[in-house]
Amino acid sequence: MNGTEGINFYVPMSNKTGVVRSPFEYPQYYLAEPWKYRLVCCYIFFLISTGLPINLLTLLVTFKHKKLRQPLNYILVNLAVADLFMACFGFTVTFYTAWNGYFVFGPVGCAVEGFFATLGGQVALWSLVVLAIERYIVVCKPMGNFRFSATHAMMGIAFTWVMAFSCAAPPLFGWSRYMPEGMQCSCGPDYYTHNPDYHNESYVLYMFVIHFIIPVVVIFFSYGRLICKVREAAAQQQESATTQKAEKEVTRMVILMVLGFMLAWTPYAVVAFWIFTNKGADFTATLMAVPAFFSKSSSLYNPIIYVLMNKQFRNCMITTICCGKNPFGDEDVSSTVSQSKTEVSSVSSSQVSPA
């Protein structure tokens, strides 16, 4: 084995030289130079100082502007709450531990941090899945003239939390466990060891299939069908300038949504699965640290893609920040664009974009 396994940790370095120490007791500067830990601190501080205000502003403008409190926007509020969850309970801890060079809060603190970080990340992940399903139902109408209500929206939100708990809670009760990962200053599920007491193999397979593969399939299917629907409607209207603009806007938004999701979760899932299937293989601390930080960065670009790129949300935010005035003019576009002359207007960008 090319790593060192302790009672509740796994350090990706052999202890033949005797330098490996518990990540709960000593700085881990033998894994990476101190400046790399400071770089992590700077990165986490950037995420906190940018993601926290944007997500708080999302909640504020939704509360202040009644026109934003529509059932199709509930999941965006849930996404903002999940991102705030990650920032408050995950990023702040990582910042402090990275500054010290090791996980100073001990095994119990590691389990708590790992749980909250996983919970927030999973709520955000499943919010994107529910968002894709909602857009598919509203635009593609697989159930006919289905009326999407507040009850359906709340059911979708409840589903995200149930799925998140089903992923984050098991390691607290003996199905896998949380331990320091990467540079040993943040915690995640145990992908590294064969310990039969924790049944890590079955948990990792469960997590990979249920909490990554299935969301990817659902998102690709939902947004793929949505784009096809928009193009069909545009073709029926003989590619007028309006329908072409709507088609391009919808396609661009969908591509950004899918790329954002894949950028956040694919690197982490792939590296974690590689470590899981190659236990004992040689890998550096940064191999797991970098993908983990990719997933954390979703708390910043999620609101950018799903909120700030939406005209209605963006204009309401500008109005709120500027004390009731919009210095850029009134370009508010309601998410309930009038459905009158053409079929494509029923699948316009304002309906399939995240508002």
UniProtKB/Swiss-Prot annotation:
What is the predominant subcellular site recorded for this chain? membrane
Q: Which GO terms describe its molecular function?
A: G protein-coupled photoreceptor activity
Instruction: Share an example GO biological-process annotation for this protein.
Output: G protein-coupled receptor signaling pathway
* Record bears the keyword Coiled coil: no
> Which residues does the annotation flag as glycosylated?
N2, N15
Where, in residue ranges, is this chain on the Extracellular side? 1-36, 100-113, 177-202, 277-284
Could you tell me which residue ranges are on the Cytoplasmic side of the membrane? Answer: 62-73, 134-152, 231-252, 310-355
Location of the protein in the cell: Membrane
PTM comment:
Phosphorylated on some or all of the serine and threonine residues present in the C-terminal region.
Q: What does this protein do?
A: Visual pigments are the light-absorbing molecules that mediate vision. They consist of an apoprotein, opsin, covalently linked to cis-retinal.
Q: What is this protein called?
A: Green-sensitive opsin
Starting at the broadest rank, the lineage of the source organism is: Eukaryota, Metazoa, Chordata, Craniata, Vertebrata
